[in-house]
A protein has these predicted regions:
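A solvent-exposed, acidic/Ser-Thr-rich amphipathic alpha-helical stretch
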Residues: 1-41
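A beta-strand edge to alpha-helix "cap/lid" segment located at domain peripheries
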Residues: 24-118
């Protein structure tokens, strides 16, 4: 699993389930602009939402193997301020777990927020 809110690539179905399972709880809602097939073995969704009062947009590409199992997920969020917030919230939730390494700490997210506000 790759994405703009991640600081690395999370591998395996267990990681995908844990990360996506919590990520879904952060959305106030999801307004889908497009959902559909992407090539022979893919799926794409484009949606907007709000997380803790901040607007966020996302384009997600999911790839499947011949058996229909997910082999790759790439999720790209925007704008940058919302990406930093999302990664921070995920990092706080997964603190102390093996998934924490994939997200920004509170301090790192705050430092980046300050840098983009300059």
């Amino acid at each position: 699993m790759e994405g703009s809110v991640l600081t690395g690539i999370a591998q395996g179905p267990e990681a995908r389930r844990a990360i996506l399972g919590f990520a879904r709880t952060l959305y106030d809602y999801q307004e889908f602009n497009y959902v559909g097939r992407y090539g022979d073995h893919g799926f794409v969704e484009d949606y907007t939402s709000v997380v803790r009062g901040q607007p966020i947009g996302s384009v997600v590409v999911i790839r499947f193997n011949e058996a229909g199992q997910t082999t790759r997920i790439v999720a790209n969020h925007r704008p940058l301020g919302s990406v930093l917030l999302w990664s921070q919230l995920m990092g706080e939730h997964f603190a102390g777990t093996r998934y924490a390494q994939y997200f920004l700490s509170h301090d790192d997210a705050q430092a980046l927020h300050e840098a983009i506000e300059r």
